[in-house]
Amino acid sequence: HTPGHTPACLTYVIGDAAFVGDTLFMPDYGPARADFPGGDARALYRSIQRILALPAHTRIFVGHDYPPADRTKPAWETSIAAQRDHNVHVKSGISEDAFVTMREARDQTLEAPSLILPALQVNIRAGRLPPAEPGHKVQLKLPVNAI
């Protein structure tokens, strides 16, 4: 269990591989945001530290990638050593308080993801779509005046 991005985040360690979902991204991007429902920057830092305590040779597979401007191709695999040495926000030596301050300040500048409302509706239903309405249409309903 590696909460922080959301309270439900998990990391699966199988042999020399760790599947971290959205907890960590590639070192040149940093970790996940922590401002989603139930997210917590301090819990995220502690989860990342548990991941970074794995052996240096452990391969990390990220859930998705946001290539920065100086990297044109998406990536999906990194290592504990690369994260410790090069992660722009949580490399070795970053204190918990410094990380929490940075993460919370940065999260305040980020817009909500474009698909957050439909994603929340499906997540709340444990991945199930709502029942079909008359005419056999399955619809997600979005509020027009609130998030």
Go through each PLM region and give its residues:
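Catalytic core of the metallo-beta-lactamase
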Residues: H1-P68, I147
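Accessory terminal helices/loops
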Residues: R46-R59, Y66-I147
